[in-house]
From Swiss-Prot:
Keywords: Ribonucleoprotein, Ribosomal protein. Part of the 50S ribosomal subunit. Contacts protein L32. One of its GO terms (molecular function) is structural constituent of ribosome. GO terms for biological process: translation. It comes from the Bacteria. This is Large ribosomal subunit protein bL17. The gene is rplQ. The keyword Nucleus does not apply.
């Protein structure tokens, strides 16, 4: 029985779930908005919102905790230098999940967009590949 066990299993092993949400969190922090299934978007909030709360603390221990989740120094720098300052004074609710009307072709899965509630300053790292194309 799964009494009081929060979170969805998504038909994956714990290590697969951890890798999935780590990759989705990296994509959201990099692009600011991603399209995924509705359930994954709702579960991703449980990973990303504490990361932004860590960015608001902005101390060495918070950076190390964020690195343990993200595994990328560039993303930790972007999180603490660009994304965190955009949410100063906001008590929570850093992301929004917008349901899309059309389901995914093939398996009819309900889709959603997860994005930040505030606009985040564009980084030079994210802008450089766009200018090169």
């Amino acid at each position: 029985m799964r009494h009081s066990n929060s979170g969805k299993k998504l038909g994956r092993t714990p290590s697969h779930r951890k890798a999935l949400f780590r990759n989705l969190a990296k994509a959201l922090l990099t692009h600011g908005k991603i399209r995924t299934t509705e359930i994954k978007a709702k579960e991703l909030r449980r990973v990303v919102e504490p990361l932004i709360t860590l960015a608001l603390r902005n101390d060495l221990h918070a950076r190390r905790q964020a690195y343990s989740v993200l595994g990328s120094h560039q993303l930790v720098k972007r999180l603490f230098d660009e994304i965190g300052p955009a949410f100063v004074g906001v008590p929570g609710g850093y992301t929004r999940v917008v349901k899309l009307g059309q389901p995914r072709r093939g398996d009819c899965a309900p889709l959603a967009i997860i994005e930040f509630t505030r606009t985040v300053a564009a980084s030079e790292a994210a802008a450089a590949p766009a200018e090169a194309e």
